[in-house]
Amino acid sequence: METNFYKFFKKSLFTDLHLTISDSEDSIEMNVHRIILCAKSSYFNTLLTGEFRENNSKDLKIIVQDRIIARDIILNMYGRLLYNDDYPDWYYNLLLIQCKDFFGMTINPESIYKLKVPSEAYDLLVQVVNMFKINSDLVSLLVDNLPSEYDLSKIPINVFQLMCQHTKRDYVIFPDSKKIGIVELFGSDFTNKRNYIQTKKSPENITVSSNQIAVSTYSGSIHIYSLMTLEKIHKIKTSCVKLSYTSDGSYLLAVVRESEISVCIIVYCSKTFQIVSKINIDDFVNVFCCTSDNKYILVANKTKIDVWDLQTGQFIKTMGICKNKINCIDCSSNNKYIASGDDDGQTIVWDFETGNIVKTFISMSEIYAVKFTLDNKRIAYGGRNRKLKLDYFGNTDTLSNKDYILTTLSHQYYEYIYDIKFTSCDKYIVFSGRDNDIVCVEVGTVNSCHRLDTKNVTIKNIGVFSDYNNETIRNYIHQMKNKNSEKIDI
C-alpha cells in the first residue's frame, strides 16, 4: 500500500499541501498529502489539525536543522527506503534521529550503536545519546568514540558515571624478580595485559594506593612510583621490613628496624613524604594495619594487639590478647571490627570499641591471612590448611555459623595462603601463597578459579586496585581526585 502512496507523491496525485522545508542554507519544495504527514508525525498532526493558521492553508513552510534529511524522512513516510548520498554515515544517522524527534516520531538508538564519529562531532554524539534512556550499548558508543582531549565535564554526571563503570578494571600488583608486575583482571581471569616496573633489586614488600605504588627492596630503600605513569617519583633511604598505605592513600607506613633491639613504625605523608609521626615499639612487629579514618594504627606484637594514635604516635590501649602468635590482622572499613589470625588456627573478630570477641572461627592449622569484605559482613581467611574460607561473622545473620569454603588448593606445592585481597564490590577474591601462583576466585562459586603463574617462589603480599582502561577518563578522574572534587562519586 505504501508503495502506491509513493507513486501518488511522485506524480503529485491528490496532493493537498505545498510544503517548503528550509534550513540555514537553502529550501526544498514538495507537494505532499496532509493525511500521510498527520498519520506519521505528531508534529504535523498538531500543526495541520490544531488551532493554527496552517490548518486550512494550502502552503506550509517549516524550518529544520537539515532540509535534506527532513526531506528523506518525509519520503520515508511514503514508503521510500532511507538512503544517504549526501553526508557521511555518522552525520546522517545522528541528524536523522534529531530530525525524527523534531517531527515527533519514534526514535531508536540501535542504528547508531556501531557508529564511528570524528572527534569534532563528539558534542553532537553526546546530544543525540542524551535523547534516549541510557543503556550499555550507548555507554560503549560514547567510550569508543571519546576524543583524547575531550572536556568530560560537559557530559551529564549520571552518564559519565556509567562511562566510568564501563571502563573500570581491577588490577593485581605483585613483586617479581627484580621487577613489579601489574596484570589486569577480566572477571576472575587474568588477561594478557601486563606491565612491569624494573627494579635494581628484587622487591621485598609492596603496597598500592589510588595513585601510588610503594616498594621496599633488600637494598634498604623505599621506592615510590606513580600509578599513572609507572615512573619513580620518590625514594626514601631507609631499611623497611613491612610497608603499607592507609586505605585512602594519605599516609605511607613503614616498619623500620633501627637496631637489633629497636623497631619503630614511621608514618609518612604520601604527598610530601615528610614524617608525620614515629612510633617506637619495644617488641617485634608481627603485622600492623590502620583504621580507615586514619586515626589509629593497630600493631600485633606476638600475642597481643596494641592501638596507637597515627598522628601523635601515642599509645592508646591493648586489645585482642591471643593464646599464640598473631600472624595477620585487618580492620573493617567502618572501623567497628578487628580481625586476627594466629598460630592456633583461630580467626577472631573483635569489637574495636569494647575489645570483646564477636566471633571465633577454628581451623586445623595456622592462619596467615584475614580480610574483611567491603560491606563489613564477612571475613575471608586462610593459611596453612590449604583452604580459603569466607564466613559471615554477625551474630544476627542466619549464615553466621556456616563455613563457606571458597576453594581448596589441590596443587601439591601449595602450603600457605599469605595474602588475601578483595576486588571492587567484593566480587572476586585474589590471594597468594608459598608458590609461584596468584589465584583469583569469584565469590559465590567453587569452580570459577584462575591462576597466574608469576615464576616467583613465594609471594607474601599483593596489591589489588581499580583503574580505568580509557586514558581520557583515567586522566580526568585523577585530575579531579587531585583537586579534591566532590563532583565524582563512582
UniProtKB/Swiss-Prot annotation:
Keywords carried by this UniProt record: Repeat, WD repeat
Species lineage: Viruses, Varidnaviria, Bamfordvirae, Nucleocytoviricota, Megaviricetes
Family membership noted in the UniProt record: Belongs to the mimivirus BTB/WD family.
Stored Gene3D superfamilies: Potassium Channel Kv1.1, Chain A, YVTN repeat-like/Quinoprotein amine dehydrogenase
Species in which this protein is naturally found: Acanthamoeba polyphaga mimivirus
UniProt KW Repeat keyword: yes
Spans traversing the lipid bilayer: none
Disulfide topology: none
Repeat as UniProt keyword: yes
SMART domains: WD40
Spans of repeat WD: 196-235, 237-274, 280-318, 321-362, 364-403, 412-451
Record InterPro entries: BTB/POZ_dom (IPR000210), SKP1/BTB/POZ_sf (IPR011333), WD40/YVTN_repeat-like_dom_sf (IPR015943), WD40_repeat_CS (IPR019775), WD40_repeat_dom_sf (IPR036322), WD40_rpt (IPR001680), WD_repeat_multifunction (IPR051179)
Pfam families noted in UniProt: BTB, WD40
Residue ranges of domain BTB in the record: 15-91
Protein name, UniProt field: Putative BTB/POZ domain and WD-repeat protein R739
